[in-house]
Amino acid sequence: MNETINREDLYLFQTGKARQAYLTFGCHYQKKTKTHRFTVWAPNAKSVSVVGDFNFWNPLAHPMKGDKDGIYTIEIEGLKKGDLYKYHVEGYDGICRYKSDPFAFYAECRPDTASKVWDFDDFKWSDKRFINQRKKRQTLDQPMSIYELHLGTWRMPQEEEREFYNYREIADMLIPYLGEMGYTHVELMPITEYPYDLSWGYQVTGYYGVTSRYGTPEDFNYMINELHKAGISVILDWVPAHFPRDEHGLAMFDGTHIYDHEDPRKGSQPDWGTLLFNYGKPEVQSFLISSAMFFADVYHIDGIRIDAVSAMLYLDFGKQEGEYVPNEDGTNINYEAVDFLRNLNEALRTTHEGFLTIAEESTAYPKVTSDVDDPEGLGFVYKWNMGYMHDTLYYMELDPLYRKDNHGAIIFSMDYAYSENYILPYSHDEVVHGKGSMINKMYGAYDEKFASLRTLYGFTMAHPGKKLLFMGGEFAQFVEWRDKEQLDWFLIDQYEMHDSFHKYVAKLNEIYKSEPALYELDQDPAGFEWCLQRDADHSVVAFIRKNKKGRGRKQQQILCVCNFTPMEWDKYKVPLPKKSKLTKILDSSELDFGGDGDVSESKVSTKRVKVCLLYTSPSPRDTERSR
């Protein structure tokens, strides 16, 4: 960390150009003077001091010196790792507040809120080769199957005196599981420090600290390092849209709205009861961009998924008429947020080659994944395809009798599949708040639900776009995700259908990763060809996926056939490539997957909803196949 503060570092912070503000601000050990230096931005404060265990929380003991720009600093002797501290801020409004350090690397576990003096030990990373290969491994033509995870409830200790597993314990259980299931990436719901469990981490008070619920920064280092050693990339949920009003956090930090807006029509998010960042302030941009960079620089994270991008882009998001202020041209676009997102993506992607930035953006805002070289591009690598998720779940919830009248829901996604670089998400948001679990969303009785979910997952795995599934969905947990209880792992051990479904998802991942036709041309229309698109009466679709052509490399083609009804169609015609010799790769009706066993090497036959994947070869022609 920086031994001294120089004017250039402060200039970068004040102009929105800082990318490593964490080296200047916060608490840092100074080897030369054997002191700890504290630095904080509080431009409108009347006074700031450091208080903690070491001075009996006395605001008069260690007053900080402020400059003309409101940057306060002090060096204190005799501190040790783990000492508790806060800033005592006498605000512009005359109110004295005890504030956590916005740049703290570690903090007390809730409900306590003090920051901790924390000097990073020399953790011995062993993932250099993995990091060096990131650019090649995370290109658009590589497979990506993401397991979305909430660390606190994936597995929980059975001992009453323990609330959570440690980062290290989680790593030792999670890594073999991800390997067994064939996932390429894991996405962690927010682990930046937060006070309220039921926010799931989406109301952040510590943008530079991993939550102490699961251990120390060194424990988190261990988890990331071990995941990398196992070949698994790590994506973090990161929340730069809004922050909570908690007294110890960023709100009214110096008695004024330095991180948000003074006008509540600009600075308040009524749906969530939170405050919106003011991206027009260069210091706020420096603070947030440096936070994302910190996790890439220090913790070796491979990507971030940015939550609630729509709430950033639209001034009227979640608001009624009169509750927001239009921009200067009278529209609802937040141009300051657009500027911030472009700066963020450019900083991360140029500094860390192959780094993933993923937008959870629920509207049709254009060019989310266009490069920042495009004046209108936001610069993300991927965008969640929320439309695909909504349409496919709506379709699968229908009685099969009515699916023919809603056939567009299952095919519409291909009309815009190449407008952005998409991830197809079945995330935590879809299995909470009474929405039902993935298996319970499916129409029908017990066996039909499983047949339908196998079909949906198979269809999704073959559909253009990268993949994401929230924990529990891989073994068809019947209850919704419960944010205070672990997953129902007993289902795999005690119920054959759940065990078989679990194996089916692992098989899908295995096939997906081993077949370039299923991922290489996700962003290229040349990699997809409809065979059957509009047969609404039978609720059948069929399409071919293709890999890249290359010198000395034969193009592979994979046929996907989906029957979305429990009907058996006799001598059903599917247009297939000329002189096709079909070899079945997967049939969701196989007994091993919980199906009825109605399978054949020479036929695609079924009495249930199902999906089949088959090898074929080029040049289309109508060929009669029995169904």
Predicted regions and their residues:
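Conserved small/polar residues in nucleotide/adenosyl-binding loops
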Residues: 615-622
